[in-house]
């Protein structure tokens, strides 16, 4: 009968404890991700800044009441004549004041603007969640729809805001939908970074644009940089394939996630002018 060498028992015991500590560490890491996930998903700048102070004096600040009682800020620039009105949903970081250059570009030709500051961002009450952001979008849509016909309303979603814009366009009539750096779902984006974690099972706010985009009937423009290392363009291409409405995909060579500027607005104006 073979006798095990003492070193073998020690090695197996060490391996056993190594596996146990690895599993405990992994479990603790996953638990921490779950508990803190919204702090990792939303990065609000909470300071309330008047449009004029931010550099957009033609905008009026309005306060909207969401269905669940939160009060959210929006900036409103009325259009000239029969120009379209862009209902703008920003990304997961910053606030409206950091997007003033974009708003100037959008309104330079007389187009109108309603730019929403989500709950927890830039003077709005509450804390961001997917359900909450969609409620905020519905409040902003109601404000806009009360003043302008649906066919003049253009939804513009930026990054995380594409999930909000798609959710709104899937249930309310609009003239056009513009998606800048969109994704199939926020879980798919998260899985790019946390590939070793079951993100789809743990994530609360998934913004499943892939399940909603098929209900959109308005023409859709997708804008994406091919150097985007936050939302890979492959996710936008997958979402694009699910669109049933008239659509166009504009790719920007050498452009990263946060680098789309006036060229995006120019592409959007061309798209809107052809309809």
Tell what function each PLM region has.
Residues 18-64:
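An N-terminal hydrophobic leader/cap segment in hydrolases
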Residues 67-147, 151, 169:
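Membrane-embedded segments
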Residues 102, 209, 218, 232-241, ...:
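Short alpha-helix in the alpha/beta-hydrolase fold that links the catalytic acid
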Residues 142-146, 150-196, 212:
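Primarily recognizes the serine-hydrolase "nucleophile elbow" in alpha/beta-hydrolase
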Residues 215-217, 222-224, 228:
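Short beta-strand/loop motif that positions the catalytic acidic residue
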Residues 226-231, 257-259:
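Acidic catalytic loop of the alpha/beta-hydrolase fold
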Residues 255-265:
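Catalytic histidine-centered segment of alpha/beta-hydrolase-like enzymes
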Residues 263-275:
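Catalytic active-site module of serine/aspartate enzymes centered on a nucleophile-bearing elbow/loop
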